[in-house]
Amino acid sequence: MKRNTWKAVSLVFIAILVMTLFAACGERKNYDTQSNNKARSNTAIDKKQGTKAGETFNLKQGSFVIPEGWKLHEGDSTDDKPFVVPVSYSGEGKLDNISVQYGTNPYSKDDIDSFSHAILLQLNQQISGHEASQILASGFTSKQGYPVLKYEFTVDGDRIVQYYIASDHGHIFVYESNYSGSEDTGRASQSIVDSFKWK
């Protein structure tokens, strides 16, 4: 009887092991497919989007000019979420970067105060439990005439600046990660905000 039980346990163990191996192979194949798709979409960006300083990057909802001294980081960028990095970036270390992305929200651009308070509440929830500074919130009008909300803070020693270029029930989210503390990064993100034009 003990021998039959041992056989059954061994068979179950082997079956689980085989299923795990098949599942792992399937996941790897899926990952490879995703990587190939991302590589193809990044190739498309090279041909139709601006990649260097002074060139225009087009989103579905609008466009912005890549700032002087910066370039498109083609490895991480997509048509919906481009990343720009300093031209001097060699591919190693923690790099300052700026991402640009469209998002939706339930607020009209005339109700910017409610939108501002909602963002502030969300940010405070996100940084709770981290070593973070107080959030400095402000607002201004971009050079193109759009209302912009700006939030500055540090999290775990890293300087973060977020801009929201508001429209009716949507916004362009410009996210500055400034690890070096360089003022150039701040100027670059401000340049993106000021050059952005809605379609």
What function would you assign to each model-found segment?
Residues D76-S167, H171:
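Conserved polar/disulfide-associated segments of primarily extracytoplasmic proteins
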Residues K2-I16, T20-V84, E176-K199:
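N-terminal targeting sequences that direct proteins away from the cytosol to non-cytosolic compartments
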